[in-house]
Amino acid sequence: MARKKKKNSFFGWTAAIIIGIASFITGKNWTEWDTTQTLIEGLNQQADTSRMEIPIKKEGQGQIIQRTGYTLSYDAKNKTPQWVAWELTKEETRGNEERTNEFQPDPEVIGAKVVTYDYSGSGYDRGHMAPAGDMKWSKKAMQESFYMSNICPQDHNLNTEDWNDLEMKSREWARRYGKVYIVCGPVYNGGRNEYIGSHRVKVPDAFFKVILINDTKKQAALGFYFENEAGERPLSEYLISVDSLEKLTGMDFFPALPDEEENLLEKEIVNKLP
């Protein structure tokens, strides 16, 4: 498992020092979003796009946080991730770590930190982006999957039914094809203007997930788009071309693929699941 990187706390410590100095000098409230965003941009962070699962956000890149089992870009304005990306291997699906169910503020998030109580009484689930079920191979990976930076307000029925069905299907594909690369996150398209909790976590309009199967036996890029509402529909009804999702999200998925290969896979409209 040499590919797994220990989380690098350099950016977290650097940000903490910047915030501490700035607060001492000015005494201003550094939880304000525009100030937080300025600090994030000042770090000049870059995600490792040589890794197959890492996307490129064309505008407004968030705070990059590297975890044991996934990487995310955190949106300080909406208090949710922009995207969460990870590789899931056949071996990792055989893990037996138990869920902790201990939702915690993310210690590396710059600025205001979402807490589990922001979701209390909201009517929304604490919806994992990188699922706990994909992190059973490591105690640390499991614990980190419960950081609130990996969570979005999600319709209960969607979280427990169709979204969960796709998580299980992804593990099935990882076992069948050796590994899969996954990116997912919320979609904000202006359809609703709803916030929850004292930290004003913005409720997504929808969610996307893209899955790359890049095996000698099978190669496919699957795009899924879920409205943030009850569904209970076949997963095939959520399929959408990856090209369409790139336009919706402003992201470039799987940029590590050769251009010709990437273009061919992403423009394909898949009508059925592998």
What kind of region is each of these model predictions?
Residues 2-274:
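Domain-level detector for secreted/extracellular nuclease and nuclease-toxin modules, and
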